């Protein structure tokens, strides 16, 4: 039974999604259906945690909108996710960045930048 589940999940998993880690700033294009129309809605924020693996992986993204903190839990393999783009690589020393919830203003999104191999070359 376990092999059957793994086989089905392997066919359902998306390969076009980049590796996202806590601390990264990402821009996610989500499909939104309003009546008969379908449009894309961008959501840009800091990844404060991830959960699960494979087809059930989710990421929690936080942004500040008009002075109010907004968090969305986004299933990575959802058909409503058009694309995920990493805007900035962040350096986090823990897996869950829930301490950002207590911060206000610019400090609420402040995470040090991670140096990547491509940036150093």
Swiss-Prot record:
One of its GO terms (molecular function) is structural constituent of ribosome. InterPro entries: Ribosomal_bL19 (IPR001857), Ribosomal_bL19_CS (IPR018257), Ribosomal_bL19_sf (IPR038657), Translation_prot_SH3-like_sf (IPR008991). It comes from the Bacteria. One of its GO terms (biological process) is translation. Transmembrane segments: none annotated. One of its GO terms (cellular component) is cytosolic large ribosomal subunit. It holds the Pfam family Ribosomal_L19. Keywords: Ribonucleoprotein, Ribosomal protein. This protein is located at the 30S-50S ribosomal subunit interface and may play a role in the structure and function of the aminoacyl-tRNA binding site. Belongs to the bacterial ribosomal protein bL19 family. This is Large ribosomal subunit protein bL19.
